Design a protein with these regions (language model features):
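Low-complexity, intrinsically disordered or signal/transmembrane-proximal segments
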Residues: 3-5, 17
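Short terminal hydrophobic/aromatic SLiMs and anchors at protein ends
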Residues: 7-12
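Residues lining hydrophobic/aromatic ligand-binding pockets adjacent to catalytic sites
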Residues: 13-175
Length: 175
């Protein structure tokens, strides 16, 4: 299958992604966080659950627009929701916080995620802060973890949400 159909961008080696994650979290504190972000790549479902429960997460907010994993069916919406609920947490899917396929395709064509960030800030963050932040803060049990796929939060749209929430006075940490 041609790369454009898989909708992937060049990805850094896992070691570098983990280093970037440490840099991202450098000025943040897990103890002071009132929300979390998390990527599931490179984790077993057991590791995902252990990380969430160890940090007191009450609600996992899935911010993938299309919550299906072809490679890891246990992380598709129905299976993941069941797993999360079996461990006493709440699963919530917020597809409006995801990135549409056509925007990801444009990023691939350009070879940079900047296309995603620009689109996301304009079409998701601005309305989210303007209309949906109150709903988001009051419709789920806290603390929440915003979940997507990537290890490095800076390679994922969840970092844009994190920056927006931090701009509003909240404190985040990537698990």
């Amino acid at each position: 299958m041609p790369q454009a159909h898989r909708l992937t961008l060049p990805t850094l080696p896992v070691k570098r992604q983990l280093e970037n994650k440490l840099i991202w979290n450098g000025a943040r504190s897990v103890e002071k966080a009132n929300f979390f972000t998390i990527g599931y790549t490179g984790r077993t479902t057991k590791e995902l659950i252990t990380t969430l429960t160890a940090n007191g997460v009450r609600t996992l907010v899935d911010i993938r627009q299309n919550p299906i994993s072809m490679y890891r069916p246990e992380l598709s919406k129905t299976n993941l929701a069941r797993l999360i609920e079996e461990h006493g947490m709440i699963y919530a899917h917020f597809p409006q916080l995801g990135v549409p396929r056509d925007i990801r395709a444009k990023a691939i064509e350009s070879g940079t995620r900047d296309v995603i960030w620009e689109w996301y800030d304009q079409h998701v963050i601005a309305p989210f802060l303007g209309r949906n932040l109150h709903y988001f803060l009051n419709c789920v049990e806290h603390p929440v973890a915003l979940m997507c796929t990537e290890i490095d939060p800076q390679e994922c749209h969840r970092h844009r949400l994190s920056l927006a929430l931090e701009h509003m006075g909240m404190t985040g940490f990537d698990l």
